[in-house]
């Protein structure tokens, strides 16, 4: 039997939750009718009753605020691996990350089936230098199991003051025992575009992730390559391996640089602002010179937008391994009290109308995970063509004529 005092406590919690739901209804009042459904008052009462039971009967004292925060987290995290409720510290962390630099180990992660999975280590980061790979599962941080209910907690534990160390234990397919990495945190600066001339006429552009400046940085890199070559490029290797994604607009800008026309990406969601189609504008930075795009399991999100746009528009061949398969768009929505909710608001589709979510994009030319030829190891100071077998194969593909042996074939003809 519930006593009078417990009834009062239950009433108080019910009122608090009722006020919150009422405010939510007010917020939704100017939204489309599809979003203005009846609020689940019966479920709200059940929530209040459970909270009251926990407060009264749980073995240890509990904090109302922490209980409600946990309830909110559980609600949002149950949606998909990429949606999350962000408290003040976590929201600040998101803003720091988007600024282009932070102190940490440089790993892009996602939550999948209650496991923290490495999407990709950022190029040049402590994690990349130590050998952490896309697909690794982070099991422990400093010997303590990761919190599989809060991705933000895991990210926060990996970040810290520059120069400090953190021990990360990972599970890797093919390894019987967990692998241990001791990493020294450093300043992670997101320089997203690097370029070099592989040989006369053949350019190489590496995009490590997509930031707000990536489009402009690509334009500058291509101009520099043309200047160093002394003429227009005859082919380009676009390296998107282990690129975890980033800013959607940057991916559209990169795709548009190589397309004369056609759809780049289409997004579909429930609200008008979450539905859009991005189309290419006239002008091809390479004037039709062929492109090979290198991809692997660490190529995700915005990187997959570029790969899909160039492949489906018959502008490039993909070489490597199937991409990660993150075909969704997240929007960070600020809340009162310097908090926010990160929600998946759209699914995006390649120009052919295919959603790559959870399936990825298969390459035109598949390469094994270890593409290095047998023989003595190559010095890190050696030219890229000597130390990266996949880049070498991409250049070979760029040189292969497909019509009558003339070699003077347009990209559209070669890649259909």
Question: Which ranges hold each PLM region?
Answer:
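Short acidic, Pro/Gly- and aromatic-enriched capping/linker segments at domain boundaries
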Residues: 337-346
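Cleft-lining beta-strand/loop regions that shape enzyme active-site pockets
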Residues: 31-43, 47, 52-64, 117-120, ...
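Terminal targeting/pro-maturation regions of precursor/exported proteins
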Residues: 2-83, 116, 414-416
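Extended, small/polar residue-biased N-terminal targeting/export presequences
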Residues: 58-119, 163-167, 171-182, 189-192, ...
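Structural motif
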Residues: 135-137, 354
